[in-house]
Amino acid sequence: MQTEIDASVIVKEKEWLETNVLPEFWESMSEGLKEALNLISSDDPTVLVFTSPKTDAVKGIVSRSSSNVVRVNVTAKVGRTTHVLKLKDSAIIHLDQILNLSNYMHYALYCLPRLRHNTERAIKELQEILHAIVCLLHSIMQEESEKEEIPSNASSISLKSQNSIVSRTSNPFSCLNHSPRQIHKTVRNHLFSPPLPSNLALSFSISNASVCLHLFRLSGPNEVLESFAKNSVDIEMLKPFVSQRIDAFSQDPILLAVTAKLSALQKKVNDVSYRFKTISSSLYGAK
């Protein structure tokens, strides 16, 4: 008799959650995703200042608009030589991490109305998508070669001391079976004016709500370096030829706001998931 009463109470609690909590939850998830998507998709340029307070290795300005870098005007000292890194006026650099981030948010918004009838599946799907997004925003490009670490107005990251993080985030899509491996590529040298010399390679990534600039000095056969300079290549291909690496980081206020919103949404999903799992396990135990 007591078991039947307990089961009845648990069923009523589950019904109350579905009636009073879930509608507001779905609405807040949809609104939060739309707000984050609008922020990250804005075409208004975000100007990022790269400075090196302890050294003068890297200094200048980078502008991001939506998922593209649209302006680069940076000076970099590599060895004894100072290079001017200036993106051509008509050129853009695609930030694949931000493009993937936008795609995931579009996918989440697409799934929400189609999965709401199946609470357990919808919550699980949202957990996976949001986990992938948060991993994507915190992914760190692995570094195995010698580099010079450059701080900026955002805290610099010691990549060699982050191996445990890299192992979890070098593939930020691993929690979704259909997702590809994140690949970091170089920028074609001819997109700059003047073009970068063939012994230099430049790449951008996103980490900890910052835009990260990675500059590589290369050594090797001229034909290999010329091939790298003409193409956008996977950073992994450069590693045998890297003699120096310089990293600079500048925190992006829009990425910071998006990260905060998505982290809050992730917490909401986890809280609702925990409540339903608790009710389900209690209901099972009462039978």
Swiss-Prot record:
Alphabetized UniProt keyword annotations: Cytoplasm, Nucleus
GO cellular component terms listed in the entry, alphabetical order: cytosol; nucleus; RAVE complex
Principal location listed in the UniProt entry: cytoplasm
Residues that span the membrane, as ranges: none
GO biological process: cellular response to calcium ion; vacuolar proton-transporting V-type ATPase complex assembly
Domain of life (superkingdom): Eukaryota
Keyword rRNA-binding: no
Role: Component of the RAVE complex which is required for stable assembly of the vacuolar ATPase complex V-ATPase.
UniProt subunit comment: Component of the RAVE complex composed of rav1, rav2 and skp1.
PANTHER family linked to this entry: LEUCINE ZIPPER CONTAINING TRANSCRIPTION FACTOR LZF1, PROTEIN ROGDI HOMOLOG
Protein name as annotated: Regulator of V-ATPase in vacuolar membrane protein 2
Organism: Schizosaccharomyces pombe (strain 972 / ATCC 24843) (Fission yeast)
Organism lineage: Eukaryota, Fungi, Dikarya, Ascomycota, Taphrinomycotina
Gene name for this UniProt entry: rav2
